[in-house]
């Protein structure tokens, strides 16, 4: 029944170095899996109390009401159609419903195709945004490493000019990756990124990663400022007959621990910037991770990467099957 979850979905690079990474993902999402194991393993009949407990587990895992209701409706339908009565039998029913959940998540699992993009977009400009503390600057360092692993040259733009620590942190990531960082103390964010793009063109760099200052979606003046940054980026690298204007990718970085607040962040930043992809960070901590299912239903924007640690290799492409297996603790069933 769970054979579809046992398949190894890692790419060859992940197979070499990903075992510990996948283990950290499972560990970070273990709370939900252990709760489900306890619910199904204690025996008893399938009744309204059992469904209510399952609903609570899913909601507290940040799956959200909409996605939870859809999953439970499918589960109840399956139980009726197959005349199931024992709690332990819900594993089979849940596996059936997971197949539908995978269909929901699979369209979101769209890896960043930078190698293909630079054939017509060079430099390929990636703008990163998000609230304070989501892990933007750290994600840029990891993303630089990931892109270098694909044989691409990278330049970093220190567009978070509000925090000196952000420039220093980006410089540190640049040193660790042997990547040039363009920064100005007290400079204008748009000007810094503009200069970085010009520098990348002169050096024939493949990819520019542009950091921006963290901001709350409710801070209207700061949201207007980041719109200006995007407009300036478009002026630095305007549309051509073969390429759209930069930025070619707008990545929103989300802290997995923010739960349902992530939905409002996605909505606000997408309205302001036209978000093309998401990075979900900090899945190695207390994150419950079900918010991805909620995002899939409310704002189906591709999840490009998920992160589970501080190491350079701890940012990986999102694989729906691996994620759902780890989230629901069913990979070993």
Kindly give the residue locations of the regions a language model identified:
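Non-catalytic terminal/linker segments enriched in charged/polar, low-complexity residues
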Residues: 1-127, 149, 154-155, 176, ...
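P-loop/Walker A NTP-binding module and the surrounding RecA-like catalytic core of P-loop NTPases
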Residues: 99, 108-333
